[in-house]
């Protein structure tokens, strides 16, 4: 076959024709541009300006807990600070703390002519609840971990925190701040560094050692001012800045859950445990913070990070001397508003206060030069000379003068929204006496944004001091964002909120938080939210510790709590004290101890309990004294006039009768009943050797006790005790005995209940499981003068048994004078919002300092939104705001209208009361604007 030869040009033309036929552009240059040059090739290797290269952070040094800067010598330390609670504080107290803070700034740093120390304070509101939720989960006692009740609580609190931190806030606070209230944590961070030039002199410390010395002084001074400084590790620094420069990552999705997952995945990797070499690239600390290239916008003066515009607004000058806590402290605003300037700033604002520790001789020389230049008789010259003399005078009185700057970082989704936030910020600052630089007057806004980032500012390069201004150390202390709202101890046994939406955590059951005991007194007038608060506290403590709860109540305020606990796997035992209920309390059952341990029988006078010194010596139970109180209640019926008739001789005979009954019943091997003590009294009364008057008195007392041996009272007080089953929650409804006319029966029943709890505490004291005896409506129970001394007697040693006495009341008027030792014994006081006259009533039972009175008077309540209160203990003194999840509010509703709402749902839908309460909670979520989540499922619903 003959091969056919084709010309190469024909093949190329056919190739081009085929491409044209398919609509594909022809290959090759389609323009007449010049060929590439060597210069064009070189530009391939040129790097564009880098945002990250302007940041000085190179490497975290774990040995010195410092961040190495770009010069390879300078190091910086990062701290996270607690804040000083300013709510309800008096001016004198605030001034003392401010002076301590001022002294810390003045005394912690060495003043250097070259390379001075720089202090930067940053404050911002964050809604990242991850660290708290992880801390809460880790804090749960092993006994409660994994239980249905605990997991339900952890999920509920997580959903609640996410719901209340929505943009715009959960509600408008029209009573206190007149601003939206939003769940958020105000985080305050401190950065300390000094730029080093050249090699240190022979007598100088190395940069790391010098930083360590300064940080130790600074932390000690802050602690003296009541501020805890916690050193930030590399991961914590990285997490903070990662969120700053990546505010809206969408690599894994655009929702909050996806963003949180991104932050977790992008965390600084842990050092390898194996002996492997580090990577040769991408280990720069600053480079690891960026997952998108920042873009500069010189036209609008913003940086675009993650597609969001960022801007900084710098303070031009102070128009008036700042007050204590000027920016972040709670102060009066206008007629009746009480808030902080920072509360009024736009969301996502970051405050930065920079202070340069300037030598005083340099500043004095500058002042002298300024004074010499102010010549002439013009008004400006005279004013300048006066200001210079005043400044020199203040420096001479140990008020140091430094240089400083104040900046505010803003961000939003669009330029228009960012401009609106800038206007909002400027208005808030101007109203507070702070004049910001107008955005259009900022010469180099992109540089300013970089300048006030951590560790970027170098005082040596600011030769003309254009970017800082003179600032007294006292004014810096007033402006510092360490003023704020209380945060508690950090132990999340109980979690509440403050007025700014931040968390308050404390734990009476944690021995690090208590100094004496975990006994608790909760007082709240009618309508203050006492039932809801106590319900919320019990839910939290039960979820964290799974204690044994004994709840004594009148009015079924905790019936739904018991149903809820039972639906989640806790065992519940209910007792109702009413005729025909089949309950027997056996008030003299402990009399057998008098025979078993006769050497331990105490004969102390009950009145001696008013003496604190004698009370402190009571390391063992006074069983005989306790039983005497029970017998006296039966004899006198709880009536004051009958109690006054009792003489010391009568009391001695009562004790003798109890001992006689105990010995007789021990011989018969049976428990002591009320009738046995009655018979012992009659036996002594029938003794012919006794004086006639004594015999008559004894028979009268026996007849009085006989009332408890017949009729309805016999079933409850004159039978063998009914054994209590093992249960997580024991709910005792006082029923009939909570009414008027049953004072004696109520007191005796309560004593018997406390005895039963005490016996369980003694039996299980080695198991390590706490017991909490909760008494609601305490004013009904403790109004009997004999009962409070008894409670002091028996609960004095509960600290050793791990049992705690919690008392709640809404009425202080019914508490007798004898209740004072009982209330003084209690370390933890929670006082809900109350009128001024109630504060005065509290002072009857507890000495209140002026600061504590001021705190109590400042607590408020807004129906349907929140209730406030004050926590007082040996280690805490703070104001809190209760904003519980809707579920816990629904379980504590005791008003008639609220009960009717549940009853209507039960009738309409044929569900249990607990299921009706869960539905009420869902309706409350809708009213509060909380997004509906998956239905709450319990066994009872």
Language-model segments: residues:
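Anion (oxyanion) recognition and catalysis
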Residues: 223, 430, 542-543, 799
């Amino acid at each position: 076959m003959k091969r056919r030869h084709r010309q190469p040009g024909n093949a190329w033309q056919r190739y081009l024709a085929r491409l044209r036929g398919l609509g594909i552009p022809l290959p090759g240059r389609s323009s007449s541009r010049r060929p590439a040059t060597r210069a064009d090739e070189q530009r391939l290797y040129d790097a564009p300006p880098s945002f990250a290269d302007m940041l000085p952070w190179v490497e975290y040094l774990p040995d010195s807990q410092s961040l190495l800067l770009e010069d390879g010598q300078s190091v910086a330390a990062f701290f996270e600070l607690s804040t000083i609670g300013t709510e309800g504080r008096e001016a004198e107290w605030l001034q003392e703390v401010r002076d301590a803070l001022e002294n810390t700034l003045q005394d912690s740093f060495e003043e250097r002519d070259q390379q001075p120390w720089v202090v930067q304070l940053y404050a911002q509101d964050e809604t990242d609840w991850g660290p708290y939720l992880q801390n809460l989960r880790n804090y749960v006692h092993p006994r409660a971990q994994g239980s249905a009740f605990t997991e339900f609580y952890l999920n509920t609190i997580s959903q609640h925190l996410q719901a209340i931190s929505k943009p715009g806030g959960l509600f408008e606070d029209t009573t206190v701040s007149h601003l939206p209230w939003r769940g958020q944590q105000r985080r305050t961070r401190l950065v300390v560094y000094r730029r080093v030039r050249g090699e240190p002199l022979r007598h100088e410390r190395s940069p790391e050692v010098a930083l360590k010395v300064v940080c130790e002084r600074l932390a000690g001074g802050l602690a003296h001012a009541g501020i805890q400084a916690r050193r930030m590790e590399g991961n914590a620094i990285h997490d903070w800045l990662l969120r700053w420069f990546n505010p809206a990552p969408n690599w894994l999705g655009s929702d909050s859950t996806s963003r949180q997952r991104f932050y977790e995945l992008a965390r600084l990797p842990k050092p390898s445990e194996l002996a492997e070499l580090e990577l040769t690239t991408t280990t720069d600390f600053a480079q690891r913070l960026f997952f998108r290239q920042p873009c500069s916008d010189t036209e609008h003066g913003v940086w675009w990070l993650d597609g969001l515009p960022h801007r900084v607004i710098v303070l031009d000058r102070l128009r008036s001397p700042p007050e204590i806590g000027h920016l972040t402290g709670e102060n009066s605003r206008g007629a009746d508003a009480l808030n902080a300037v920072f509360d009024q700033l736009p969301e996502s604002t970051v405050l930065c206060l920079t202070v340069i520790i300037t030598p005083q001789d340099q500043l004095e020389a500058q002042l002298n030069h300024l004074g010499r230049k102010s010549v002439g008789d013009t008004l400006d010259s005279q004013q300048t000379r006066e200001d210079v003399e005043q400044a020199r005078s203040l420096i001479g009185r140990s008020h140091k003068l430094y240089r400083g700057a104040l900046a505010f970082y803003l961000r939003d989704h669009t330029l228009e929204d960012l401009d609106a936030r800038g206007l909002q910020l400027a208005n808030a600052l101007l109203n507070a006496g702070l004049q910001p630089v107008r955005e259009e007057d900022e010469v180099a806004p992109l540089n300013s944004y970089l300048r006030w980032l951590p560790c970027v500012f170098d005082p040596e390069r600011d030769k003309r001091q254009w970017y800082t201004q003179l600032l007294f150390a006292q004014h810096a202390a007033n402006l510092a964002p360490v003023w704020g709202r209380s945060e508690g101890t950090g132990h999340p046994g109980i979690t509440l909120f403050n007025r700014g939406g931040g968390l308050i955590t404390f734990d009476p059951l944690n021995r690090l938080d208590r100094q004496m005991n975990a006994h608790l007194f909760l007082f709240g007038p009618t309508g203050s939210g006492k039932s809801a608060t106590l319900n919320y506290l019990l839910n939290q403590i039960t979820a964290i510790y799974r204690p044994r709860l004994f709840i004594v109540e009148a009015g079924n305020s905790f019936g739904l709590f018991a149903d809820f606990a039972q639906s989640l796997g806790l065992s519940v035992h209910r007792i109702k004290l009413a005729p025909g209920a089949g309950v027997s309390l056996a008030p003299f059952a402990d009399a057998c101890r008098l025979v078993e341990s006769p050497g331990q029988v105490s004969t102390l006078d009950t009145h001696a309990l008013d003496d604190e010194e004698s009370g402190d010596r009571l390391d063992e139970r006074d069983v005989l004294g306790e039983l005497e109180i029970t017998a006296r209640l039966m004899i006198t019926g709880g009536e004051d006039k009958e109690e006054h008739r009792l003489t010391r001789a009568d009391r001695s005979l009562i004790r003798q009768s109890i001992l006689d009954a105990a010995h007789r019943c021990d011989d018969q091997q049976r428990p002591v009943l009320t009738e046995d003590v009655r018979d012992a009294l009659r036996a002594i009364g029938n003794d012919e050797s006794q004086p006639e008057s004594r015999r008559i008195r004894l028979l009268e007392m026996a007849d009085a006790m006989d009332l408890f041996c017949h009729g309805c009272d016999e079933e409850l007080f004159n039978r063998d005790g009914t054994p209590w089953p093992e249960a997580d929650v024991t709910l005792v409804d006082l029923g009939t005995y909570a009414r008027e006319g049953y004072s004696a029966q109520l007191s005796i029943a309560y004593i018997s209940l406390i005895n039963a709890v005490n016996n369980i505490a003694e039996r299980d004291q080695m198991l390590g499981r706490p017991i909490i005896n909760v008494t609601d409506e305490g004013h009904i129970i403790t109004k009997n003068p004999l009962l409070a001394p008894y409670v002091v007697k028996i609960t004095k040693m509960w600290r050793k048994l791990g049992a705690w006495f919690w008392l709640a009341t809404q009425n202080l008027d019914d508490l007798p004078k004898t209740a004072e030792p009982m209330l003084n014994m209690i370390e933890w006081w929670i006082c809900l919002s109350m009128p001024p006259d109630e504060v005065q009533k509290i002072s009857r039972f507890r000495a209140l300092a002026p600061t504590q009175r001021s705190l109590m008077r400042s607590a408020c309540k807004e129906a349907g939104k929140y209730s406030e209160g004050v926590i007082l203990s040996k280690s805490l003194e703070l104001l809190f705001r209760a904003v519980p999840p809707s579920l816990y509010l629904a379980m504590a509703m005791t008003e008639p209208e609220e009960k009717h709402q549940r009853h209507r749902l039960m009738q309409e839908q044929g569900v249990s009361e607990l299921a009706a309460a869960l539905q009420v909670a869902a309706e409350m979520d809708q009213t509060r604007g909380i997004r509906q989540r998956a239905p709450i499922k319990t066994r009872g619903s």
